[in-house]
Amino acid sequence: MPLRSEEGPYFGDFGGRFVPESLVAALDELSAAWEAAKADPAFHVQLDELHRSYTGRPSIVTEVPRFAEHGGGARLLLKREDLNHTGSHKINNVLGQAILTKRIGKTRVIAETGAGQHGVAIATAAALFGLSCTIYMGEVDTERQALNVARMRLLGAEVVAVKTGSRTLKDAINDAMRDWVTNVETTNYIFGTVAGPHPFPTMVRDLQRIIGEEAREQVLALTGRLPDAVAACVGGGSNAMGIFHAFLDDENVRLVGFEAGGEGADTPRHAATITKGRPGVLHGARSLLLQDEDGQTIESHSISAGLDYPGVGPEHAWLAAIGRAEYRPVSDAEAMEALRLLSRTEGIIPAIESAHALAGALDLGRELGPEGVVLVSLSGRGDKDMETAGRYFGLIEEGAVQS
């Protein structure tokens, strides 16, 4: 059976639905609405038109030869999801789920966010569709992504800083799930990645598939052939599944996900879930998790808020298990150096999340040599990361006014 035809709820041993009884009806309703929407031409017409006139799709592919000189001379092609409205791939998923929210008659949306890109996309869609909106964000992330907090609030969303646990993405998801249980009659949870209980992994992947479908045609037109490798950063894994999916059945195309190696995958401070994780259940699905000897989820670390998550989408865990995709850690330092290098060689400032894929792509380029072609998901732009990058590289003078 073609790998692209996998629909869940299970991907091999991973996936499923492990949730409180109070959420089963809401998930069933969402699953039924999603199946009905997929079969309804009007849904696709509405979503396609929004992508054309609002998101700005199709996103372009940019070749980056000066950057590629640092990676063995292979051709590096960037799929520019950073140019989408709201600055990342997140809008692809959010618009589809916002339409679904209206179709099932809910008036309020909630979401989790790490880097704030999903939150900004949700707040944007809520404004567009006239929905009430609450965003849960770990307190640590509200501090390192203050610009996106301001954006969400300007767009009319309530932003709740989560002060429990590690105060990052995992804890934001926990609180959003609690809200959904309490307010399920009026509220739809717009999950941001390919994790969580069924139908989220499949639905989010399907809404992000447009990345790879566009890129496949664009690379063929540009190079006359498929790429040797496709690279993407992996936290929960939605941008990666979005670009990988179109190539799943092309056996000669390597699919490589780059996880947050933090201070090193052999230290306690990383978020390299596939590299170092073991099977377990988190946020309603069975996948690979970072956990201690007692099976308790342990804190992850990444300089990137969007990759700072101790789990991963179940389809990624499955692709790793069957050997179709490979996953490697990229350290904070490697990602930040790639961010600076792309900025200085090509005039494109990537998100720190995306910079993990860029660092990995340089390694792939060296492995493939000058004849190689690597397609990279540039999942977001770096505006939100200027304070982090400014501190990291010493670019902001002490006491300088920041605007």
Swiss-Prot record:
It comes from Leifsonia xyli subsp. xyli (strain CTCB07). Signal peptide: none annotated. It catalyses: (1S,2R)-1-C-(indol-3-yl)glycerol 3-phosphate + L-serine = D-glyceraldehyde 3-phosphate + L-tryptophan + H2O. InterPro entries: Trp_synth_b_CS, Trp_synth_beta, Trp_synth_beta/beta-like, TrpB-like_PALP, TrpB-like_PALP_sf. GO terms for cellular component: cytoplasm. The modification N6-(pyridoxal phosphate)lysine is found at K90. The beta subunit is responsible for the synthesis of L-tryptophan from indole and L-serine. Keywords: Amino-acid biosynthesis, Aromatic amino acid biosynthesis, Lyase, Pyridoxal phosphate, Tryptophan biosynthesis. PROSITE patterns: TRP_SYNTHASE_BETA. This is Tryptophan synthase beta chain. NCBIfam families: trpB. Belongs to the TrpB family. Its cofactor is pyridoxal 5'-phosphate. Pathway: Amino-acid biosynthesis; L-tryptophan biosynthesis; L-tryptophan from chorismate: step 5/5. One of its GO terms (molecular function) is tryptophan synthase activity. Its EC number is 4.2.1.20. It comes from the Bacteria. Tetramer of two alpha and two beta chains.
